[in-house]
Amino acid sequence: MTLADTIFKENIKKIMEQGVFSENARPRYKDGNVANSKYITGSFAEYDLSKGEFPITTLRPIAIKSAIKEVLWIYQDQSNSLELLNDKYNVHYWNDWEVGDTGTIGQRYGAVVKKHNIINKILQQLEANPWNRRNIISLWDYEAFEETDGLLPCAFQTMFDVRRVDGDIYLDATLTQRSNDMLVAHHINAMQYVALQMMIAKHFGWKVGKFFYFINNLHIYDNQFEQAEELLRREPSDCHPRLVLNVPDGTNFFDIKAEDFELLDYNPVKPQLKFDLAI
């Protein structure tokens, strides 16, 4: 069993057995009912990517390509435009969070990256001094939140650090999320930011190191309990999936494309499970 599958099962079991129920929940299901959840707080996981430990479960299929395309939309295009996400990447799951008839998700994610020139600043800082301890992406922008409606960012902070080991430089990353839908989005979010970590490492010709993942509120929605029990019953596949980025070292961050990524040795358990999302 992979580390990711072990952590996934442990978290599901902990939420189901020790979690508490939300109150006054904001989200709604498509039928209009309140989307309450069972949750735990303070979830942490550590993966050593350099040793082949990737945060993706084999207990159900995970849509990696669309997840990576979302990262490109946020950090390369630096956009909040749903038209761009739909037309350029053929990714449509953000459409449910459109703000009014604006065609956007509000001043969120890519709009905040562009507003503060975040990615260019991170790349410039790492180039000037890789060992500086100030490489932080923060999407938590109160001014932007007051400017428009929109879903507040779930994965809102990423920190980067480097280590030199036996002459090689390794890039580590720490992702912080305020909230995470354990069954649906956990591995999507984790692998998105592993992809971002890999892109930055490639830009400088470094190796990927460790990925640290902290979630403040890790939850399972109350219409997903049957799926949770099914996942606990499933036996993981005998495979060890790993994500690779097939571009030369030194490839410019902004030149990397979704098709440059390849998920190897991934044979997840089927059938896929269905989930009614909370909006």
Swiss-Prot record:
Its EC number is 2.1.1.45. Keywords: Cytoplasm, Methyltransferase, Nucleotide biosynthesis, Transferase. It catalyses: dUMP + (6R)-5,10-methylene-5,6,7,8-tetrahydrofolate = 7,8-dihydrofolate + dTMP. The keyword Glycosyltransferase does not apply. InterPro entries: Thymidate_synth/dCMP_Mease, Thymidate_synth/dCMP_Mease_dom, Thymidate_synth/dCMP_Mease_sf, Thymidylate_synthase, Thymidylate_synthase_AS. DUMP binds at R133, R134, R178, S179, N180, D181, N189, H219, I220, Y221. GO terms for cellular component: cytosol. (6R)-5,10-methylene-5,6,7,8-tetrahydrofolate binds at D181, A278. It is found in: Cytoplasm. The active site is at C154 (nucleophile). GO terms for molecular function: thymidylate synthase activity. One of its GO terms (biological process) is dTTP biosynthetic process. The keyword Iron does not apply. Pathway: Pyrimidine metabolism; dTTP biosynthesis. Catalyzes the reductive methylation of 2'-deoxyuridine-5'-monophosphate (dUMP) to 2'-deoxythymidine-5'-monophosphate (dTMP) while utilizing 5,10-methylenetetrahydrofolate (mTHF) as the methyl donor and reductant in the reaction, yielding dihydrofolate (DHF) as a by-product. This enzymatic reaction provides an intracellular de novo source of dTMP, an essential precursor for DNA biosynthesis. Belongs to the thymidylate synthase family. Bacterial-type ThyA subfamily. NCBIfam families: PRK01827.1-1. Homodimer. HAMAP family: Thymidy_synth_bact. This is Thymidylate synthase. It comes from Streptococcus sanguinis (strain SK36).
